[in-house]
Amino acid sequence: MKVTLIAILTCAAVLVLHTTAEEELEAESQLMEVGMPDTELAAVDEERLFECSVSCEIEKEGNKDCKKKKCKGGWKCKFNMCVKV
């Protein structure tokens, strides 16, 4: 009885992992397709750059030291700009 239960749970775990890996590969392949528009990525880049610059300028006008705003998603704030890490 125990062996059957362990076998069923193992098969279920393998199936879940396989499905997750397959979905991830499919998502990556869609991103890697040639000719896919990057306009959305460019818009995000511009937005992060703008947010970082504006945040730093506002702090400078308030006579405070410019504390760099943390950028999200693999970006960091440097020279009043968000740059990819």
From Swiss-Prot:
- Subcellular location per the Swiss-Prot or TrEMBL entry: Secreted
Q: Which InterPro entries match?
A: Hwtx-2-like (IPR012625)
Q: Name one Pfam family in it.
A: Toxin_20
Q: Which UniProt keywords apply?
A: Disulfide bond, Neurotoxin, Postsynaptic neurotoxin, Secreted, Signal, Toxin
Q: Name one GO molecular function term.
A: toxin activity
Does the keyword field hold rRNA-binding?
no
Q: List the disulfide bonds.
A: C52-C66, C56-C77, C71-C82
Q: Output the Gene Ontology cellular-component terms.
A: extracellular region; host cell postsynaptic membrane
**Proregion span(s):** 23-48
What is known about the tissue distribution of this protein? Answer: Expressed by the venom gland.
Q: What's the main place this protein lives?
A: secreted
Leader sequence segment? 1-22
Protein family per UniProt? Belongs to the neurotoxin 12 (Hwtx-2) family. 02 (Hwtx-2) subfamily.
Q: What does this protein do?
A: Neurotoxin active on both insects and mammals.
Q: What's the subunit arrangement here? A: Monomer.
UniProt name for this protein = U4-theraphotoxin-Hhn1a
Question: What lineage, starting at the top, does this entry show?
Answer: Eukaryota, Metazoa, Ecdysozoa, Arthropoda, Chelicerata
